[in-house]
Amino acid sequence: VASPAVREMSEAICAALRAPSRDTLVSPQVHQGAVTELSVPRVRNRARPGALPDGAFWTATPLDDGTSDTWGASGENLRSATDPARYTVHFDPDVARIVRIDTADDWAELIAAHPLDYRGAHVPDWPSIAERWDAVHLSALGLLCAHPRLSEVPYDRYEAGGYRHSQSGPWPGVGDWSTVSTAWLRIPERFEIRPTAPVRR
């Protein structure tokens, strides 16, 4: 980015998102949807391997208003209207092995340590990641930044949105994650799920 004003604004946004008050990896997290029994996640690569694991237990970060979370606020959790079950997920950050994705380098390094070749690109090998980590957390900063540089991806003048561009580089961006969230690949010690009252709409 050549414009000094754009660079200055970008640096200010990144600094704000790195502030301790913006930390999104907090306990408790929120899980929406019925939980009948907590079992060990069976993490697999999807039929079309990519940025998302299959079989993970997903949680979202609660928001300051106390009634919503990052999944609900993003509009991605369409089940919440018909399945109001909501749980708080308590964990010990000092015990759980959680890799944080705050930057493009964080995401690229995770893939480089656990690569799976798919159609000429390296994508995350989720069973391999699950052997090393209990969870992967995507922060707000990571949601914005964990994508391959535009210079690494062939230009497609027919694509206006940039999504396909993000997915066609030497490694995929995190666009499929959609929002700030945590993918639990294993259940660590000191992990507890408690039912909470449904969110009032």
Language-model features and meaning:
Residues 1-39, 76-201:
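Active-site and NAD+-binding cores of ADP-ribose-processing enzymes
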Residues 38-82, 88:
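Extended catalytic/binding region for NAD+/ADP-ribose chemistry, centered on the ART fold
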